[in-house]
Every structure is written in structure tokens, then in C-alpha cells.
Amino acid sequence: MFKTLDRYIIRQFLGTFFFILVTIMLIAVVFDISEKTEDFTKMKASTWVIIRDYYLNFIVYYSNLFSGLLIFLAVLLFTSRLAHRTEIIAMLSSGVSFPRIMWPYFLTATILTGLSLLINHAVLPSANKVRLAFEEEHIRATYHVNEKHLLREITPGSIAYFESFNTNENIGFRFSLENWSNGELTRKLTADRAQYDSVSGAWRVSDYLLRTMDGSREHIERGQMLDTIINLKPSDLGQRWESSMAMGWTELNAYIKAKLAQGDGSLMPFLIEKHQRTSYPFATYVFTLIGVSIASRKVRGGTGLHLALGVLLVLIYIFTMKLTSVAATNAGLDPLIAVWIPNVLFALVGIWIYQKAPK
């Protein structure tokens, strides 16, 4: 049964959190509108379509993205207010233990964690699919290719190579297509450039050289133009990592498996996205533990000092997240470990602060 204390803390927790969430989202929408005003005036989409397809899904995405940090600020704010009004001291003096005070906090954190997990795995992919489709239709390109020396295994034994690729013109430079059988090269097509025809789905190669090996014999063919159909699209060479956010769990796993089979080495953002969908919601428990442990102590600086400490910890947490993501991308750190390191480190910090909290 919920006691008056439990209902009071849960009401304060949720009320403060949703107030901060609504305020931050209103500010974010205003800033985004001011930034994209020129884009909106150029596009043919109606105001209703912009609101329905873009901003409603924009709010869903960023509300969930910042939920952990906003929960932390909410806990700091209302717990600091309770401490400033000596309500925490009154609870402890009346015989209520500090772990008992923590119970409604963690009950609320469990509700918010479950909600975030549900949104991450069931709601957000569909919302992001609509939002990103709107952005790609009206604001930005669907994909981009920044890498050099692109290598893709189209089918077993069939390998395509581009030295560089121009996404605006769908043209690849220094193109080659190799066919291997039993460890031996049987056919190799090289060309100065290859342009993709989106209508026919074929690649048109220019100034090509085709070598065909038949045992000890080699046939060479040169030409100015040749159309060849291969199971490769420009979007397979480079896709915005944000597209991973629009994929459901099954779709994301299938995409990762297919790209690994092609030898695509740019999958780390997709792997990080996959594991973060589960790891990030659990940061709610960590933020709640740290927030209560810091803000429950009545200090001379009051709420201002608690907020300053909270902002500092948030910045360190974000820095740790970025650091581990970079380590996963560039240093070979396992992405599953990388996304959980910030939670584990800050959980240890939270336990230490909790032990120092007044009881």
C-alpha cells in the first residue's frame, strides 16, 4: 500500500519531471522553427503536415533522448526543495529510514525506465521513420559518402571497389568489379568512373577494361561505355547513421548482418544505436540515486549549489558517453561494453555518494 509519503514524493517527482520536459520541448521546438524557417518557406508541405510528420515525432524523439538527464534535474530540484524546507530532516527524525525514503523514488524511476524502454523499442522507430522521411524529402539528402576506398562484397566472390564516390551525381571514380572462384580471379572489370542509373538500376562504366581469365588464357576487352547490373545501390555505399533510429529491432539486426556480409566497416554507429536502446533507459536509476543522494543534504548554497553539481555531473556523463563511443568506433572497444560503461561508472559514483548522504 502507498503511504502518504510515497504519494507525495511520486507526485513531486512526476510533476517536476513533466514540467521540465514540457518547458524544454517548447524551447527546442521554438529554436528548431527559427533554424528551419527558410526551409519551411521553400517546401510545398502544409503547416499541418509539418506539425504531424515532423514536430510531433521531433518531440517524441527528443523527449526520450533527454529523459534521463531531465529526470536527474527533476530529482535534484524537488529533493533540494524538500531539503531546504527541512522536510528530509523531519522524515528522518520521525523514524523513517533513508532507504525507505528512497523507495518511492526508485518506484517512479522504474515506471519511467519501463516507459522509456517501451518507447525505444516499440514507438520510436516508427516515429523516427516518419520524421527522417520528412527531413530527407524536404531538408537534406537521404545518404552521404565521406569515406575513400570503398569496398563491398556484393555476393560471395563478387567484390566492387570505388576509390571515391560523388553522391550528388551518383558517380564513383576508379571503379573495379572482381569475380573470384575457388580463390582464383576469373573476371575483373576496371573503369575510370561508374555512374548509377536510378531508372534501370544499372551502372554505366566509362573507359573500361574487362579481363576474363580462362585457365591459362586471358581475354582483354576495352571500350568507351558499358552497362552492368549488380546488386549494389549508391545508398549501400553510405547511409546516414540516423537511419538506424528508424529501424525496428528485427530490421536493425538484419541490416547489420547484411552489411557485415558485404564487408562494410562503417557499422559501429548502428551497433551503438542497437545497444543504447536498452542501456540508456537504465541510466534513470543511476541519475535518481545520485540526484537524491546529493540533494537530500541541506547546504548553504541550497538549490543553486545542487544544480551546479548536477550540471557538472551531467557534462561528465555526456563526455564519458562520447569518449566510449569514440573508443568503440576507432579503438575497437566492444559496442555493448562501450554503451554500458557510463552507467556502471556513474552507478559506482552514485553508491559512494549515497553512503555519504545524511541518514
Region annotations inferred by a language model:
Residues 154-200, 205-208:
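Structural signature for solvent-exposed beta-strand/loop edge elements and short helix-capping sites
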Residues 207-215:
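Short solvent-exposed strand/turn elements
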Residues 219:
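An exposed, glycine/acidic-rich loop-and-rim segment of catalytic or binding clefts
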Residues 191, 222-224:
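N-terminal amphipathic/hydrophobic interface segments
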Residues 226-228:
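Short beta-strand/turn micro-motifs at beta-sheet edges
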Residues 1-156, 167, 184, 214-216, ...:
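Transmembrane alpha-helices
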